[in-house]
């Protein structure tokens, strides 16, 4: 039974989607004015793993991630760079999507943009005005927070405490300081759209309510984002959406923890951020994914060069185990009679697989799940060191375990091949045989070219006096 931690209720709850086999999920996307950094990467990799696990246990996931492609920050950056806001936002949408591909994050089903949903946003605002939750002024439309009875439920504090010491937008035309903008009048030179109110553009919070309701309906299962979005963004989304429909909006609220640098949150405003584009030139994306799952998705994680190096070394140990299984399968026996060593490894595999699922069913606890991965790794290593002719069935069970882990965590991609990749492997074997013939003919120049070419493709050749020439997949 899957349980998830719900920020709204502050406890783990049994996961029951509205539709038995379908999960509707909305994750707040980026405001596209700059490069994606490691903090963003942590959020989207975390929800990618959550999505992968839900799909693994039988759900169909309908995932929506929005793009905020018009915003004060976008306008400011566009003016600084001498670009129009549309040009700038499209540039960084491309950067974001490329970064997600690099991180092996599966694409969302829909990536709606604010600028392409202005009619839906206007209609949403009109209904809020009609129902008495919003009011017009000369310069826009505001949501009247005091009209919404349960405001602050997500943040777990009352309205007075909520705004004590918090910097909020003030305006003489607002009824109350805490009221927030649904529609803003455009300043000279800014992008603007015609509306029944004033010519202008949407406020930040209304976009997610309008776009999620269009693609997922007035009620859906999971709303996610970084912890910093819980207030005011998600609090305001709840107010708008429940006021609009009169229904409970989202069943489960999930929030990811920060990536920390020297005790501070990684952020653009502090200038302590590391871009995905930059770090992926130095480290394989699987190392970054493996780094993120070292901590529970709700917990903060500290980024240091040392922590990445430590993660890299541990991941390479697992790669070596998977490669050793692949090589050992060639000398394994189907009918091997089981002895003490086989029974021991079988028990490790059975218990570790059970523990892995128990961990993932407990709010996607990757930290505990990883313990099972290392237990299997150690068990396989010990088994292969003790037997000369291993059991094929046991090795296939171990191989299958790593395949499942890889599918859920987005790891070990190079070790689990499609049929086309298997054809590639046959071609590589042919090249190795050709290289051996060239070496016998003492044509070392051509044989070295084959060796170096295969290395560039991610395959390392090892000449072993006992086993002949073998190859293994490496990360390049």
UniProtKB/Swiss-Prot annotation:
Motif ('KMSKS' region): 265-269
Stored InterPro entries: Cys-tRNA-ligase (IPR015803), Cys-tRNA-synt_Ia_DALR (IPR015273), Cys-tRNA/MSH_ligase (IPR024909), Rossmann-like_a/b/a_fold (IPR014729), tRNA-synt_1_cat_dom (IPR032678), tRNAsynth_Ia_anticodon-bd (IPR009080)
Disulfide bonds: none
Top EC class, one word: ligase
Location in the cell: Cytoplasm
Keywords: Aminoacyl-tRNA synthetase, ATP-binding, Cytoplasm, Ligase, Metal-binding, Nucleotide-binding, Protein biosynthesis, Zinc
Alphabetical GO biological process terms: cysteinyl-tRNA aminoacylation
MF GO annotations: ATP binding; cysteine-tRNA ligase activity; zinc ion binding
Transmembrane annotation, as ranges: none
Name the record gives this protein: Cysteine--tRNA ligase
Species this chain originates from: Methanococcus maripaludis (strain C6 / ATCC BAA-1332)
Gene name of the record: cysS
């Amino acid at each position: 039974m899957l349980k998830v931690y719900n920020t709204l209720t502050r406890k783990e709850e049994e996961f029951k989607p509205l539709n038995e086999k379908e999960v509707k999920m909305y994750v707040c996307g980026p405001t596209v004015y700059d490069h994606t950094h490691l903090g963003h990467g942590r959020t989207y990799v975390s929800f990618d793993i959550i999505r992968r696990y839900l799909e693994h246990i039988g759900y169909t996931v309908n995932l929506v991630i929005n793009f905020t492609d018009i915003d004060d920050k976008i306008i400011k950056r566009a003016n600084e760079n001498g670009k129009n806001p549309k040009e700038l936002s499209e540039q960084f949408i491309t950067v974001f999507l490329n970064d997600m591909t690099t991180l092996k994050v599966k694409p969302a089903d829909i990536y709606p943009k604010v600028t392409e949903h202005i009619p839906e946003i206007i209609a949403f605002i009109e209904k809020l005005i009609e129902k008495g939750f919003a009011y017009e002024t000369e310069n826009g439309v505001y949501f009247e927070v005091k009209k919404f009875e349960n405001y602050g439920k997500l943040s777990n504090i009352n309205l007075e405490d909520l705004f004590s010491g918090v910097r909020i937008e003030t305006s003489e035309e607002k009824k109350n300081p805490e009221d927030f903008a649904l529609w803003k009048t455009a300043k000279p030179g800014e992008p603007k759209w015609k509306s029944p109110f004033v010519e202008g553009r949407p406020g930040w919070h209304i976009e997610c309510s309008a776009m999620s309701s269009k693609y997922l309906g007035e009620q859906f299962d999971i709303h996610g984002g970084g912890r910093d979005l819980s207030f005011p963004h998600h609090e305001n989304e709840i107010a708008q959406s429940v006021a609009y429909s009169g229904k409970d909006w989202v069943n489960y609220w999930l929030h990811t923890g920060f990536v920390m640098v020297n005790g501070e949150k990684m952020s653009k405003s502090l200038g302590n951020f590391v871009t995905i584009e930059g770090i992926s030139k130095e480290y394989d994306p699987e190392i970054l994914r493996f780094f993120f799952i070292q901590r529970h998705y709700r917990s903060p994680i500290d980024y240091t060069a040392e922590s990445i190096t430590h993660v890299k070394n541990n991941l390479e140990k697992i790669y070596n185990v998977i490669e050793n299984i692949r090589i050992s399968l060639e000398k394994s026996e189907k009918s091997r009679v089981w002895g003490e060593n086989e029974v021991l490894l079988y028990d490790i595999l059975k218990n570790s697989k059970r523990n892995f699922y128990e961990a993932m069913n407990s709010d996607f606890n990757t930290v505990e799940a990883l313990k099972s991965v290392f237990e299997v790794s150690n068990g396989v290593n010990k088994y292969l060191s003790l037997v000369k002719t291993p059991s094929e069935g046991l090795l296939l069970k171990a191989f299958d375990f790593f395949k499942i882990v890889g599918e859920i965590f987005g790891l070990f991609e190079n070790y689990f091949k499609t049929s086309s990749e298997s054809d590639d492997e046959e071609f590589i074997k042919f090249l190795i045989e050709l290289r051996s013939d060239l070496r016998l003919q003492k044509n070392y120049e051509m044989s070295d070219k084959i060796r170096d070419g295969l290395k560039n493709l991610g395959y390392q050749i090892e000449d072993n006096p006992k086993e002949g020439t073998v190859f293994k997949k490496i990360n390049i």
